[in-house]
């Protein structure tokens, strides 16, 4: 018998297994690995697999008390990144037994909890995860799903319109509610608490909830349409968050909101369960995501955060605009928009999708386009996102020279014009500006909006881009 041999051995002897056939029940991860100079890619990939599963820096005698073969993560494939020196994609397979059922928190603690500070790596980024069907089935997922939301709101055949109330901090509850009412009356479907509006000295949450509910009901009575305001239930403790959600339910409003990254996955999953049990829609804001996902060589790609949110639960999530002021390339964005909405997504490296993902009927999430968009963007947004999206114009509603309600009218008219043109078979990409101009002839509100924002552009290079595909 070999017995226990103390000492340090190379990770790749145990954790680099290029002959391994992945199982249907494995969680698969694609990591972008940048090793330190002199560290071979196999050792770096194996180190990631080891440190995010059963390994530690030295051999321990207690390894003999378990079956490492059954529980270890395995680096099963490594490929160099085209156009980058010394950067590799390492594919790691994790056995399902390593993860607690129904816990996104535990999944992330295992896969990305420790290994990102590892000295042998210069940088590390989790690009994508393949979640096996067996694991997905342990999650409730979004409280409702896209079709259920449309049925609750009685809105079909078009994207939904929203608006974040600005200035985001400093308004009293009554003035805030007034701004909500004006927007909803003008034709928007939703208004939104800003992500940093929780319960501050200038506006406590209970006052805001009351005035916003009043605003929504008044607008509903006047327009004959169902209206909602995303009441942000994010709080300092889970108990307080649920207390706010309970109050929202007692007011009878249709939707609440949560900042899922700052609030945390445990809190988010609790809130999603509450929302399903009590018929509340759940709007998710991704505040803090760019801290994690913006750098191309380190962190975690947003498509991973989005998949995790679909498992944890949320009916809407902010997903970039492609055309506004915030980061988001078209192919990458559409890749994770499909991951949020569709039931089955094929592997497609040209859109940054590393694995085929089957969601086995887990409800979908509606992507929200928000950030620096206005009426001139409407044709592009309608074309890029299709019907199942929320288009959110904060400044693009409240910045209208005549006020909030005319700003809302302008957006609704522009949207209806784009949907009508699309349904008639017109090319929104080519004819977008003409469609908006035609509509503005019979809508003075839209004409005024077109004039204000005709020259606005946010032209900066995207930081996070796709790798060139090997020819």
Swiss-Prot record:
- Name what cofactor the protein needs: Mg(2+)
Question: Could you give the subunit structure recorded for this chain?
Answer: Heterohexadecamer of 8 large chains and 8 small chains; disulfide-linked. The disulfide link is formed within the large subunit homodimers.
The Gene Ontology CC terms held by the record are:
chloroplast
Provenance organism: Strychnos nux-vomica
One GO MF term: ribulose-bisphosphate carboxylase activity
The molecule here is called Ribulose bisphosphate carboxylase large chain
Positions where N6,N6,N6-trimethyllysine occurs in the chain: 5
The family annotation for this protein states: Belongs to the RuBisCO large chain family. Type I subfamily.
UniProt function note: RuBisCO catalyzes two reactions: the carboxylation of D-ribulose 1,5-bisphosphate, the primary event in carbon dioxide fixation, as well as the oxidative fragmentation of the pentose substrate in the photorespiration process. Both reactions occur simultaneously and in competition at the same active site.
């Amino acid at each position: 018998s070999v017995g226990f041999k103390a000492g340090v051995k190379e990770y790749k002897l145990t954790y680099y297994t290029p002959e391994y056939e992945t199982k249907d029940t494995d969680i698969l991860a694609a990591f972008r690995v940048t090793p330190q100079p002199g560290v071979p890619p196999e050792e770096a990939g194996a180190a990631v697999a080891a440190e995010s599963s059963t390994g530690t820096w030295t051999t321990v005698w207690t390894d003999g008390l378990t079956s490492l073969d059954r529980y270890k993560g395995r680096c099963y494939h490594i490929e160099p990144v085209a156009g980058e020196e010394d950067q590799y994609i390492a594919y790691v397979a994790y056995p399902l037994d390593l993860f607690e059922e129904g816990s996104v928190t535990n999944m992330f603690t295992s896969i990305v909890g420790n290994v990102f500070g590892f000295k042998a790596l210069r940088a590390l980024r989790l690009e994508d995860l393949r979640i096996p069907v067996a694991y997905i089935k342990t999650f409730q997922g979004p409280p409702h799903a896209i079709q259920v939301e449309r049925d609750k709101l009685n809105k079909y055949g078009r994207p939904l319109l929203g608006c974040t109330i600005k200035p985001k901090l400093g308004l009293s509850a009554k003035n805030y509610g007034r701004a909500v009412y004006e927007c909803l009356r003008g034709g928007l479907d939703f208004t939104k608490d800003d992500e940093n509006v929780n319960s501050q000295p200038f506006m406590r949450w209970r006052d805001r909830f009351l005035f916003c509910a009043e605003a929504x009901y008044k607008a509903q009575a006047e327009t004959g349409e169902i209206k909602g305001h995303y009441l942000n239930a994010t709080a300092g403790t889970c108990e307080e968050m649920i207390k706010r959600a309970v109050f929202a339910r007692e007011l009878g409003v249709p939707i609440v909101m949560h900042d899922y990254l700052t609030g945390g996955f445990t809190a988010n999953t609790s809130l999603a369960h509450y929302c399903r049990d009590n018929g509340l829609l759940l709007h998710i804001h991704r505040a803090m995501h760019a801290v994690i996902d913006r750098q191309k060589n380190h962190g975690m790609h947003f498509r991973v955060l989005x998949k995790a949110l679909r498992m944890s639960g949320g009916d809407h999530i902010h997903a970039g605009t492609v055309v506004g002021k915030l980061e988001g390339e078209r192919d990458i964005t559409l890749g994770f928009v499909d991951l949020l909405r569709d039931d089955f997504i094929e592997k497609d490296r040209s859109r940054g999708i590393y694995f085929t993902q089957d969601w086995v009927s887990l409800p979908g999430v509606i992507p929200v386009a928000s950030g620096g968009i206005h009426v001139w963007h409407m044709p592009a947004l309608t074309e890029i996102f299709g019907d199942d999206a929320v288009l959110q114009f904060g400044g693009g509603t409240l910045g209208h020279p005549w006020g909030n309600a005319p700003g809302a009218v302008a957006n609704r008219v522009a949207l209806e014009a784009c949907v009508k043109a699309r349904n008639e078979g017109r090319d929104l990409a080519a004819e977008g500006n003409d469609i908006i101009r035609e509509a503005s002839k019979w809508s003075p509100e839209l004409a005024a909006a077109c004039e204000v924002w005709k020259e606005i552009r946010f032209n900066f290079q995207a930081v996070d881009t796709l790798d060139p595909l090997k020819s």
